């Protein structure tokens, strides 16, 4: 009797790990490299009202997330999740985010890489610098930069995002998808309204956020990011 019970117990112990493994496979765990994008810092811009530059800190990050998320080989952390974490942890509140702080944030959201950066708009001359940080080592993997006139702001964001994909060892987009991304041109005016919508949204000023999303869509009706943002904040 004891012999039969022992055999049954051994069988159960052997089967249990297998069952757990199958359940893990069934859950379809996402093994793609995670990428988190933090708000970009204004490095001392001139030529527009201060709120526009404050908004761009969020808008550039939002558009960078969108460009990176177009690559199906990456798992990009949602902007709202990053904003909530920054508020809860008071991380980076004292100024520029250090590689060590970026790595800490990356670990909290399960990312392999964190992207931070700065921008400066000097009366229409625009420059963007982005750093990709390895979360495990806190080391800066690469710094990517681009500069142009402010009216081509979206081109700068897209160019830098494309290079960052390569730095993160992601394969390039399929040709058809890449051509579609390249054919899209987001006017700087629409991007500015979108950025201000994010600023008001994060402040809890829903009515103003709705107004800015609508203004962005009035300038560029095909603005998918503004359409999605409006759906999130507009009262049902």
Task: Please provide the spans of the model-predicted regions.
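Short beta-strand->alpha-helix linker/helix-N-cap micro-motif
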Residues: 27-99, 114-123, 141-142
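Catalytic-center loop of serine/cysteine hydrolases
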Residues: 83-191
